[in-house]
Amino acid sequence: MSVFLGYIIFLAAFFGLATGLFLGLKAIKLI
């Protein structure tokens, strides 16, 4: 259960980081 919870947190953090990086690159291209 603890490992499963840690995996979900890791996945959410990784997805959030990837999304932020993608949006940042799109913003740079627009400028």
Curated annotation (Swiss-Prot):
SUPFAM superfamilies in UniProt: PetL subunit of the cytochrome b6f complex
InterPro entries noted in UniProt: Cyt_b6/f_cplx_su6
GO biological process terms on file: photosynthesis
Parts of the chain that traverse the membrane: 3-23
One function term, GO molecular function aspect: electron transporter, transferring electrons within cytochrome b6/f complex of photosystem II activity
Subcellular location: Plastid, Chloroplast thylakoid membrane
The keyword Transmembrane helix appears for this protein: yes
Keyword Transport: yes
Record membrane topology: Single-pass membrane protein
Alphabetized Pfam families for the sequence: PetL (PF05115)
Domain of life the protein comes from: Eukaryota
Family in the record: Belongs to the PetL family.
Function: Component of the cytochrome b6-f complex, which mediates electron transfer between photosystem II (PSII) and photosystem I (PSI), cyclic electron flow around PSI, and state transitions. PetL is important for photoautotrophic growth as well as for electron transfer efficiency and stability of the cytochrome b6-f complex.
Assembly: The 4 large subunits of the cytochrome b6-f complex are cytochrome b6, subunit IV (17 kDa polypeptide, PetD), cytochrome f and the Rieske protein, while the 4 small subunits are PetG, PetL, PetM and PetN. The complex functions as a dimer.
Identification of the protein by name: Cytochrome b6-f complex subunit 6
Source species: Pyropia yezoensis
Taxon lineage: Eukaryota, Rhodophyta, Bangiophyceae, Bangiales, Bangiaceae
Gene: petL
